[in-house]
Amino acid sequence: MEPTILLLLALLVGFLLLLVRGHPKSRGNFPPGPRPLPLLGNLLQLDRGGLLNSFMQLREKYGDVFTVHLGPRPVVMLCGTDTIKEALVGQAEDFSGRGTIAVIEPIFKEYGVIFANGERWKALRRFSLATMRDFGMGKRSVEERIQEEAQCLVEELRKSQGAPLDPTFLFQCITANIICSIVFGERFDYTDRQFLRLLELFYRTFSLLSSFSSQVFEFFSGFLKYFPGAHRQISKNLQEILDYIGHIVEKHRATLDPSAPRDFIDTYLLRMEKEKSNHHTEFHHENLMISLLSLFFAGTETSSTTLRYGFLLMLKYPHVAEKVQKEIDQVIGSHRLPTLDDRSKMPYTDAVIHEIQRFSDLVPIGVPHRVTKDTMFRGYLLPKNTEVYPILSSALHDPQYFDHPDSFNPEHFLDANGALKKSEAFMPFSTGKRICLGEGIARNELFLFFTTILQNFSVSSHLAPKDIDLTPKESGIGKIPPTYQICFSAR
C-alpha cells in the first residue's frame, strides 16, 4: 500500500478514536470559551479575517478572560487594559514565562533572549539590558548613532527631488543600521548587497508571519509541519539570516581584543570565555546566535513598520503633519539636529508619535506568555505552562481610556493644557517583566527620525487624503501597512 494512503488511514483512524473518546478534559479550571472539537480545537470559530477578529468576536460573548483551543492546546486570552495589567504586572512573576509561536519554534527552540524561559531567560535578559545600555551610553551614544543615520536618510531623500517613492526600503535601512551598530559594531551602506539581502529576508519573513496561513499553522503545527507551506519558507529565511550572523560572529572571534570589546558580540564572547568551565552556563553559542537573530529581527521590522504607518497617517491627516512642523520650527528651527532633549519641549509631536504607535497597533495579539506555576487568576486555575495571549490591541483600542479608540487623534495623549498625557493603556511594547527590552532605543529612533524628516521635508501624495486607505495588508502576529507612494519635498 502507498505510504501516503497509509498515512491518511492512520490520521482517519486517530480522528475517529478521538471522536469516540471525546475531548479529554484539561487539568485545571480554565476560563469559559467555545467548545472545542477533537483535533480541530476551535478552528471552526476562526474568522477568515484572522485570529484577532476571531478573538474580538469571542470576547463579546465570553468576556475579557476566555479560553481558545489552538488545535488540541488550550490558550487563555487576556483582553482589556485592566485585565492585562492585572496579569502581567500584578502577577508579574507568575505570567513571566514565554509561550510558543509554532511557525518559528523549529528555529528558536526556547533559546535566545526573547523566547527563553526560566533562569536562561533571566541571565540573558540581564546581560542584554546591561550590554545594550553600556554601548548606548559609551563613546558614541545611541542618540549620536540615530542622528548620524537620520542625516544619511536626509541625503537619500534629497536625491529623490520630490518624486514619489515607496519608503519601505529606506525605513528598513535606517532602523536596521541602528541595531547593527550596537550588535555588530558597524553600519552598512544602503547599497551593500548582503545588507540588502538581509532586509529582504526580514521583510518577507515578517509578512509571512502575519499571513493567514501562518495563523492556521498555529492550530495544526504538529500535522502541517510535514507539508509545504509558509512555515518552511520562514524557517529557510531565518536559517539564511543565521548563516550570515554566524559569519559575523566568526570574524569577531578572529579579531577579538579582550581589553576593548566593540559591541554586543564581543561582550558576549568574553562572557563565554569567562564561563567556559561552567557546564551549566547559559552563555553558549546557541544562545548567542538566537539572541542576535531576535535582537536584529525585533529591532528592524517593528520600528521601520511603525515609521511606514506614521508617514501614511501624515498623508491621511496633513493638518497633523503641519502642526508637527510648526512645533519643530519653534523648538528646533532649521539649523541644528533634533536631540532627545527636545522631546520634553514638544508635547504635540510626542503625542502624535504615541498616537501613531497606538493606532498602528503593530503587534495586536502580543507575543505569547505562559504561566510559570499553577496560577489562580480571577477565580480560574491555570495549570503550570498554560499559554496566555495578552491581546495588546484590546488595550490600545480600549474605550475606557481613549475617547475615540478607532480614530487617529493625537488629543488622546494631550491634557487640557496641551501637555503630554500618559495612559495606562499605552502598551505597544507590552508590559510587565517581558516588556520589549529595546523599548528605549525604539522610542528614541521614532522621535529623532520622525522629527528630522519633517524638519527637512514636507510630505504629500498624488491621492487626496480621503482616498488614502489605512487598511492593513496583513494582520496576524503583526500588522503590515498597505504599500504606498510618498513625495518628500525639501522645505
Swiss-Prot record:
Changing T339S: In isozyme PB2. Phosphorylation is accompanied by a decrease in enzyme activity. It is found in: Endoplasmic reticulum membrane; Microsome membrane; Mitochondrion inner membrane. GO terms for cellular component: cytoplasm; endoplasmic reticulum membrane; intracellular membrane-bounded organelle; mitochondrial inner membrane. InterPro entries: Cyt_P450 (IPR001128), Cyt_P450_CS (IPR017972), Cyt_P450_E_grp-I (IPR002401), Cyt_P450_E_grp-I_CYP2B-like (IPR008068), Cyt_P450_sf (IPR036396), Cytochrome_P450_fam2 (IPR050182). The keyword Mitochondrion applies. Heme binds at C436. It catalyses: an organic molecule + reduced [NADPH--hemoprotein reductase] + O2 = an alcohol + oxidized [NADPH--hemoprotein reductase] + H2O + H(+). Keywords: Endoplasmic reticulum, Heme, Iron, Membrane, Metal-binding, Microsome, Mitochondrion, Mitochondrion inner membrane, Monooxygenase, Oxidoreductase, Phosphoprotein. It comes from the Eukaryota. It is a peripheral membrane protein. Its main location: endoplasmic reticulum. GO terms for molecular function: arachidonate epoxygenase activity; heme binding; Hsp70 protein binding; Hsp90 protein binding; iron ion binding; oxidoreductase activity, acting on paired donors, with incorporation or reduction of molecular oxygen, reduced flavin or flavoprotein as one donor, and incorporation of one atom of oxygen; steroid hydroxylase activity. Changing S344T: In isozyme PB2. It is an enzyme of class 1 (oxidoreductase). Belongs to the cytochrome P450 family. Interacts with chaperones HSP70 and HSP90; this interaction is required for initial targeting to mitochondria. PANTHER family: CYTOCHROME P450 2B6, CYTOCHROME P450 508A4-RELATED. This is Cytochrome P450 2B1. The gene is Cyp2b1.
